Amino acid sequence: MKLTITLALVTLALLCSPASAGICPGFAHVIENLLLGTPSSYETSLKEFQPDDAMKDAGMQMKKVLDTLPQTTRENIIKLTEKIVKSPLCM
């Protein structure tokens, strides 16, 4: 659960930072695949960012942990992220 909360907070910090002009579609795709996709689809979504092997391995370990959460929990994390990103605080 701590990992999920950490991931959600990091995601929100990145998406709501004043430096971001909007949500990077590629980043949103990676997060969606991290939470709801298959390990293969997640790995494929990372390729365009050219992570090194250590980064890929860390991401796959996080994917395995997140996949142990119930589907509805992962869907609700996505909904929460979308709600926060669309709030006036992130505009």
From Swiss-Prot:
Keywords: Disulfide bond, Lipid-binding, Phospholipase A2 inhibitor, Secreted, Signal, Steroid-binding. Residues 1-21 form the signal peptide. It is found in: Secreted. It comes from the Eukaryota. One of its GO terms (molecular function) is steroid binding. One of its GO terms (cellular component) is extracellular space. One of its GO terms (biological process) is signal transduction. InterPro entries: Secretoglobin, Secretoglobin_1C-like, Secretoglobin_sf, Uteroglobin. The keyword Disulfide bond applies. SMART domains: UTG. Belongs to the secretoglobin family. Antiparallel homodimer; disulfide-linked. Interaction with LMBR1L is controversial. Uteroglobin binds progesterone specifically and with high affinity. It may regulate progesterone concentrations reaching the blastocyst. It is also a potent inhibitor of phospholipase A2. This is Uteroglobin. The gene is SCGB1A1.
